[in-house]
Amino acid sequence: MTEDTETSSTGAGADDRTAAISRETAETTINVTLAVDGDGEATVDTGIGFFDHMLETFAKHGLFDLTVRCDGDLDIDDHHTVEDVGIVLGKSFNNALGEKRGIVRYADRSVPLDEAVATVIADISGRPHFEFSGSFSQPQIGGFTSDMARHFAYSFTMHSEITLHASIEGINAHHEVEALFKSLARTLDEATQLDPRRGDTPSTKGEL
Protein backbone atom coordinates (compact mmCIF):
# COMPACT_ATOMS: atom_id res chain seq x y z
CA MET A 1 0.00 0.00 0.00
CA THR A 2 1.20 3.49 -0.79
CA GLU A 3 2.34 5.29 2.36
CA ASP A 4 0.65 8.63 1.71
CA THR A 5 -0.77 9.74 -1.64
CA GLU A 6 -3.48 12.22 -2.52
CA THR A 7 -5.17 13.41 -5.69
CA SER A 8 -7.79 16.14 -5.97
CA SER A 9 -9.92 18.04 -8.44
CA THR A 10 -12.27 21.00 -8.17
CA GLY A 11 -15.07 22.57 -10.17
CA ALA A 12 -14.49 24.97 -13.02
CA GLY A 13 -15.43 28.16 -11.16
CA ALA A 14 -17.65 29.97 -8.69
CA ASP A 15 -20.76 28.42 -10.24
CA ASP A 16 -19.38 24.90 -9.75
CA ARG A 17 -18.44 24.60 -6.10
CA THR A 18 -17.43 20.96 -6.16
CA ALA A 19 -14.40 18.93 -5.19
CA ALA A 20 -13.18 15.35 -5.33
CA ILE A 21 -10.29 13.99 -3.29
CA SER A 22 -8.75 10.54 -3.09
CA ARG A 23 -6.27 9.86 -0.28
CA GLU A 24 -4.39 6.71 0.59
CA THR A 25 -2.21 6.06 3.62
CA ALA A 26 -1.03 2.97 5.45
CA GLU A 27 -4.16 3.28 7.61
CA THR A 28 -7.01 4.32 5.30
CA THR A 29 -8.04 4.60 1.67
CA ILE A 30 -10.62 7.34 1.16
CA ASN A 31 -12.55 8.78 -1.78
CA VAL A 32 -14.74 11.85 -1.26
CA THR A 33 -16.80 13.89 -3.70
CA LEU A 34 -18.62 17.02 -2.56
CA ALA A 35 -21.00 19.53 -4.09
CA VAL A 36 -21.57 22.48 -1.77
CA ASP A 37 -24.68 23.57 -3.68
CA GLY A 38 -26.46 20.25 -3.67
CA ASP A 39 -29.75 18.62 -2.70
CA GLY A 40 -28.65 16.69 0.38
CA GLU A 41 -27.99 13.42 -1.42
CA ALA A 42 -25.40 11.14 0.16
CA THR A 43 -23.78 7.79 -0.50
CA VAL A 44 -21.56 6.80 2.41
CA ASP A 45 -19.65 3.65 3.34
CA THR A 46 -17.03 3.91 6.08
CA GLY A 47 -17.56 0.53 7.70
CA ILE A 48 -18.99 2.22 10.83
CA GLY A 49 -22.78 2.24 10.71
CA PHE A 50 -23.39 5.12 13.10
CA PHE A 51 -20.71 7.27 11.44
CA ASP A 52 -22.31 6.59 8.04
CA HIS A 53 -25.63 7.76 9.50
CA MET A 54 -24.02 10.96 10.83
CA LEU A 55 -22.40 11.79 7.49
CA GLU A 56 -25.70 11.19 5.70
CA THR A 57 -27.37 13.46 8.27
CA PHE A 58 -24.68 16.09 7.69
CA ALA A 59 -25.33 16.05 3.94
CA LYS A 60 -29.11 16.11 4.37
CA HIS A 61 -29.21 19.08 6.71
CA GLY A 62 -26.50 21.05 4.91
CA LEU A 63 -27.96 20.36 1.46
CA PHE A 64 -24.59 19.05 0.34
CA ASP A 65 -24.25 16.25 -2.21
CA LEU A 66 -21.68 13.89 -0.74
CA THR A 67 -20.07 10.56 -1.44
CA VAL A 68 -17.65 9.01 1.02
CA ARG A 69 -15.92 5.67 0.61
CA CYS A 70 -13.43 4.63 3.27
CA ASP A 71 -11.54 1.39 3.79
CA GLY A 72 -9.83 1.77 7.16
CA ASP A 73 -8.05 -0.27 9.80
CA LEU A 74 -11.19 -1.00 11.79
CA ASP A 75 -9.56 -4.17 13.10
CA ILE A 76 -7.65 -1.77 15.38
CA ASP A 77 -10.35 0.80 16.20
CA ASP A 78 -12.39 3.60 14.63
CA HIS A 79 -9.87 6.40 15.22
CA HIS A 80 -8.05 6.51 11.88
CA THR A 81 -11.24 6.09 9.85
CA VAL A 82 -13.11 8.94 11.54
CA GLU A 83 -10.07 11.22 11.71
CA ASP A 84 -9.06 10.72 8.09
CA VAL A 85 -12.59 11.18 6.76
CA GLY A 86 -12.65 14.48 8.67
CA ILE A 87 -9.35 15.47 7.06
CA VAL A 88 -10.45 14.64 3.51
CA LEU A 89 -13.92 16.15 3.90
CA GLY A 90 -12.37 19.33 5.31
CA LYS A 91 -9.96 19.58 2.39
CA SER A 92 -12.85 19.00 0.01
CA PHE A 93 -14.79 21.93 1.48
CA ASN A 94 -11.77 24.20 1.27
CA ASN A 95 -11.11 23.21 -2.33
CA ALA A 96 -14.75 23.51 -3.38
CA LEU A 97 -15.06 27.04 -1.99
CA GLY A 98 -12.03 28.22 -3.94
CA GLU A 99 -11.39 31.94 -3.47
CA LYS A 100 -14.58 32.23 -1.38
CA ARG A 101 -15.84 35.22 -3.33
CA GLY A 102 -19.29 36.39 -2.30
CA ILE A 103 -19.79 34.01 0.60
CA VAL A 104 -21.65 35.03 3.76
CA ARG A 105 -18.62 33.77 5.74
CA TYR A 106 -20.04 33.87 9.31
CA ALA A 107 -22.85 31.72 10.70
CA ASP A 108 -24.07 30.03 13.85
CA ARG A 109 -26.79 27.53 14.59
CA SER A 110 -28.09 25.74 17.67
CA VAL A 111 -29.90 22.47 17.05
CA PRO A 112 -31.86 20.48 19.65
CA LEU A 113 -32.54 16.77 19.66
CA ASP A 114 -34.85 15.90 22.54
CA GLU A 115 -32.87 16.74 25.70
CA ALA A 116 -29.62 17.46 23.83
CA VAL A 117 -28.57 20.69 22.16
CA ALA A 118 -25.50 21.50 20.08
CA THR A 119 -24.26 24.90 18.98
CA VAL A 120 -21.75 25.61 16.22
CA ILE A 121 -20.31 29.02 15.35
CA ALA A 122 -18.19 29.24 12.21
CA ASP A 123 -16.04 31.75 10.38
CA ILE A 124 -14.78 30.64 6.98
CA SER A 125 -11.65 32.55 7.75
CA GLY A 126 -8.66 30.80 6.23
CA ARG A 127 -7.34 30.59 9.81
CA PRO A 128 -7.90 27.11 11.24
CA HIS A 129 -8.89 27.21 14.91
CA PHE A 130 -11.10 24.86 16.93
CA GLU A 131 -12.75 25.20 20.33
CA PHE A 132 -15.06 22.64 21.92
CA SER A 133 -16.95 22.57 25.19
CA GLY A 134 -18.99 19.79 26.73
CA SER A 135 -18.57 16.04 26.98
CA PHE A 136 -20.49 13.06 25.67
CA SER A 137 -22.64 11.22 28.17
CA GLN A 138 -21.76 7.66 27.12
CA PRO A 139 -18.40 6.50 25.70
CA GLN A 140 -19.71 4.38 22.83
CA ILE A 141 -22.53 4.42 20.26
CA GLY A 142 -22.49 1.05 18.52
CA GLY A 143 -19.10 0.79 16.83
CA PHE A 144 -18.48 4.53 17.14
CA THR A 145 -16.45 6.06 19.98
CA SER A 146 -18.46 9.08 21.10
CA ASP A 147 -15.49 11.42 21.56
CA MET A 148 -14.48 10.79 17.95
CA ALA A 149 -17.30 13.20 17.03
CA ARG A 150 -15.25 15.96 18.64
CA HIS A 151 -12.11 14.72 16.90
CA PHE A 152 -13.93 14.58 13.55
CA ALA A 153 -14.99 18.21 14.00
CA TYR A 154 -11.40 19.13 14.89
CA SER A 155 -9.94 17.35 11.85
CA PHE A 156 -12.56 18.89 9.57
CA THR A 157 -11.89 22.37 10.97
CA MET A 158 -8.12 22.21 10.61
CA HIS A 159 -8.25 21.03 7.01
CA SER A 160 -11.12 23.20 5.81
CA GLU A 161 -9.15 26.12 7.27
CA ILE A 162 -12.07 27.63 9.16
CA THR A 163 -12.57 28.90 12.69
CA LEU A 164 -15.12 26.82 14.56
CA HIS A 165 -16.52 26.90 18.09
CA ALA A 166 -18.78 24.00 19.10
CA SER A 167 -20.55 22.94 22.27
CA ILE A 168 -22.87 20.15 23.33
CA GLU A 169 -25.19 19.46 26.27
CA GLY A 170 -27.39 16.48 27.02
CA ILE A 171 -27.68 13.11 28.72
CA ASN A 172 -27.71 10.77 25.70
CA ALA A 173 -24.59 10.49 23.56
CA HIS A 174 -26.50 9.50 20.42
CA HIS A 175 -28.58 12.66 20.68
CA GLU A 176 -25.54 14.82 21.49
CA VAL A 177 -23.52 13.60 18.51
CA GLU A 178 -26.45 13.81 16.10
CA ALA A 179 -27.26 17.35 17.23
CA LEU A 180 -23.60 18.28 16.69
CA PHE A 181 -23.55 16.97 13.11
CA LYS A 182 -26.84 18.71 12.32
CA SER A 183 -25.66 21.97 13.83
CA LEU A 184 -22.39 21.78 11.90
CA ALA A 185 -24.29 21.14 8.67
CA ARG A 186 -26.76 24.00 9.16
CA THR A 187 -24.00 26.43 10.10
CA LEU A 188 -21.86 25.55 7.09
CA ASP A 189 -24.85 25.73 4.76
CA GLU A 190 -25.52 29.29 5.90
CA ALA A 191 -21.87 30.40 5.96
CA THR A 192 -21.22 29.13 2.43
CA GLN A 193 -24.26 30.82 0.90
CA LEU A 194 -23.54 33.45 -1.74
CA ASP A 195 -24.57 36.98 -0.78
CA PRO A 196 -26.00 38.66 -3.92
CA ARG A 197 -24.80 42.04 -2.62
CA ARG A 198 -21.21 40.92 -2.57
CA GLY A 199 -19.01 39.89 -5.45
CA ASP A 200 -15.67 40.02 -3.71
CA THR A 201 -14.03 38.10 -0.90
CA PRO A 202 -15.55 39.11 2.47
CA SER A 203 -12.34 40.35 4.06
CA THR A 204 -10.61 43.73 4.28
CA LYS A 205 -7.41 41.88 3.37
CA GLY A 206 -8.93 40.94 0.04
CA GLU A 207 -8.48 37.20 0.54
CA LEU A 208 -9.32 34.40 2.95
From Swiss-Prot:
List the catalytic activities from the record.
D-erythro-1-(imidazol-4-yl)glycerol 3-phosphate = 3-(imidazol-4-yl)-2-oxopropyl phosphate + H2O
Q: Which family does it belong to?
A: Belongs to the imidazoleglycerol-phosphate dehydratase family.
Q: What is its EC number?
A: 4.2.1.19
Q: Which InterPro entries match?
A: IGPD_sf, ImidazoleglycerolP_deHydtase, ImidazoleglycerP_deHydtase_CS, Ribosomal_Su5_D2-typ_SF
Superkingdom, according to UniProt? Archaea
Per the record, which residues fall in region Disordered? Answer: 1-22
Pfam families documented for this protein:
IGPD
Question: What HAMAP family does the annotation carry?
Answer: HisB (MF_00076)
Pathway per its UniProt entry is:
Amino-acid biosynthesis; L-histidine biosynthesis; L-histidine from 5-phospho-alpha-D-ribose 1-diphosphate: step 6/9
Task: Give the organism the record lists.
Answer: Haloquadratum walsbyi (strain DSM 16790 / HBSQ001)
Annotated compartments:
Cytoplasm
GO terms of molecular function: imidazoleglycerol-phosphate dehydratase activity
Q: Can you supply one Gene Ontology CC term for this chain's record?
A: cytoplasm
Tell me the protein's name: Imidazoleglycerol-phosphate dehydratase
Quote the gene name from the UniProt entry.
hisB
Matching PROSITE patterns, A to Z? IGP_DEHYDRATASE_1, IGP_DEHYDRATASE_2
Q: Is Ribonucleoprotein among the key words of this record? A: no
A Gene Ontology biological process annotation? L-histidine biosynthetic process
Question: Which keywords describe this protein according to UniProt?
Answer: Amino-acid biosynthesis, Cytoplasm, Histidine biosynthesis, Lyase
